[in-house]
C-alpha cells in the first residue's frame, strides 16, 4: 500500500466496491443482506512497522512499494493512529542525536492504543549492551514529557525491556468496557474501532444462545471475553503461548470467570474431540462437561482444514470470522450443505486495500 492510495475522499467508493465484490462472490450461498461496518477514514491502525534508512548523517523512515519494490520516504503514516504520527518525528530526531541508538538500527515498530499508550520497538543488526540501555532510558525520559511511552530493544536472540512490553486497550462494546492486554510482536486486531463493531455484531448474533460456546483460534481472548455473557461457559483454544497467557490475564482484568483457555491447535482439538488422541493439556478438563451448541472460528488466512470443517459441522450454530474471503468461500461450500447463513457482514479492517474481513453466522438446517 503506497501512501497515495490513502484517499479519504474516495473511501465510500472503495468500500462500495468491496461490498459489491463480496456480494458477487457469496451469491451462490444465498446469504441475507450484507451488513457493512465502515472504518475511520484516517488514523485507524493501532500499530505500524517502519523501516529506517541511513543516508550519511541523515536518518529517515521508509516503506517499499509492493508493486515496484522501490523504497519511498515516509514523513507521516496516515493509516496509523494520531499518537503514532505525533511521535514519529520527535522519536526520530532523538534517535538521530545518539550514535549508539542509530548505529545498525533498521526498523522501528509502534504499538498504540485508544487510551494514549504506545510501545516502541527498536530493531537492530547488532547486539545491544549497557551503553544502549543508558541511551534508551535517556530518550525515554525525554519522551515521557509528552507521551505515555515504553521501549523495547530487539536484536538477534535478544530482547531488552524498559519496564513492560504491552499496552492495555480499552474497548467500548455493547454498553460495557472491555480491557485487553496487547503484547508487542504478537497478533492483535489492528483496527480498534472496527474491532468494537465486530465484537458487537458477534454479541448480537449470539444474544439468545443456549448452552456453551467453543472458540478455536481465540488469540488474546478478543471474542471469548466479549461473548462470555451470552453463554453458560466458554471453552477456547489457542496455539501461541503468549496469546494464551494474555487471554488469561484479560480474563482476570475483566473479572470474567466462565472462560477456559487451553493451549492447542484447532487440528489437535479436532483429534481430541473425535477421540483420536489423548492430550496431557486436557487432563484437568472434561470435555463432556461442556454442552457447546455454538462454535466460533477465526482462522488464519489459510482457513479451516478439511477435518476441522467436518468437526465444525456438528454444532448447531457457527460464527465464522474470516480475514480471507477466498478460504471462507471454500469452507462454505461444505458448511452450507448442513447449515444456512443467517447473518452476513463486512468489516472494513483494512481500508484502501483489497482485503475484506467477513463474518457469517450459520444455523443448522
Swiss-Prot record:
The molecular function terms of the Gene Ontology recorded here are: rRNA binding; tRNA (uracil(54)-C5)-methyltransferase activity, S-adenosyl methionine-dependent; tRNA binding
Source taxon at top rank: Bacteria
| EC number(s) reported in the record | 2.1.1.-, 2.1.1.35
Transmembrane spans = none
InterPro entries given in the database record: MeTrfase_TrmA_AS, SAM-dependent_MTases_sf, TrmA_MeTrfase, U5_MeTrfase_fam
Q: Indicate which residues the UniProt annotation says bind S-adenosyl-L-methionine.
A: 189, 217, 222, 238, 298
A Gene Ontology term for the protein's cellular component = cytosol
Looking up Gene3D superfamilies in the UniProt record yields: 2.40.50.1070, Vaccinia Virus protein VP39
- Entry annotation: catalytic residues: 323, 357
* CDD domains registered for this protein in UniProt: AdoMet_MTases
What this chain does, per the entry, is described as: Dual-specificity methyltransferase that catalyzes the formation of 5-methyluridine at position 54 (m5U54) in all tRNAs, and that of position 341 (m5U341) in tmRNA (transfer-mRNA).
Q: Which PANTHER family match?
A: TRNA/TMRNA (URACIL-C(5))-METHYLTRANSFERASE, TRNA_TMRNA (URACIL-C(5))-METHYLTRANSFERASE
Question: Which HAMAP family does the record match to this protein?
Answer: RNA_methyltr_TrmA
Q: What is this protein called?
A: tRNA/tmRNA (uracil-C(5))-methyltransferase
Organism from which the protein derives: Psychromonas ingrahamii (strain DSM 17664 / CCUG 51855 / 37)
The taxonomy runs: Bacteria, Pseudomonadati, Pseudomonadota, Gammaproteobacteria, Alteromonadales
